[in-house]
Amino acid sequence: MLADGLSGPLPGGPFTGHALRHVCVGTAGPALLVVARPLTLALRLLPPGGVRRGLLRAAHSPPAAWLLLPPVAAVADVGGLWALYRTGLAAAAHHRPWLDGTLHLHKAAAGLLFGSAICQLDPVRRRRSTALRATTLLLAGTAHAVPAKTLYATGPPGTAFAAADLRAGAQVMYYGGDAVEVALALVLAVGWYTAAARDGPATPRGDGDSPPLTRAVPPRRWGSCR
């Protein structure tokens, strides 16, 4: 999906095609990659040795833990979106292929970082609480929806897209982003439910499972018989 989004023509007008590429590269593609657990897969495939230890050490390093803090990952993801569509960056990238490619790489990296911080399926240094991750996902979804709605009426500064093309692209970004955020919420909910079932208290035995109670009978002394 990332390769399809980065290469080849897409249906619709110029901005609609751009929006489809944005959804593939920046949201849907990274989300699918997060669910595939790339770090876990790499650790299983690599033989024991320096490369495997180095990868695990990098994943558990303080910088990685800081980048995987959900609010930090959300700012990197949503902040880039606002900078692209509410400044002259989109117009500049239209005339500079190297800048356009750099922005697509940033979208993919920021989307992967955000999805990893929310889902936390791979082994990380510190696992954040479900409440923090869910709240961050909700706020990031709201912040993502605002520029998508504003693009319905006003294009990025310095661009001149047709009104119909602009509206279609804005709808693709709005509903595509919502669909991916719902998928991330489902992954988060399944992880919370699984952890709660695994760490929950043991089920007490019912009355039917309890052993029968018997009254202790003192031993009979033969000398007391008459």
Show where each model-derived region lies:
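Alpha-helical membrane segments of multi-pass proteins
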Residues: 1-226
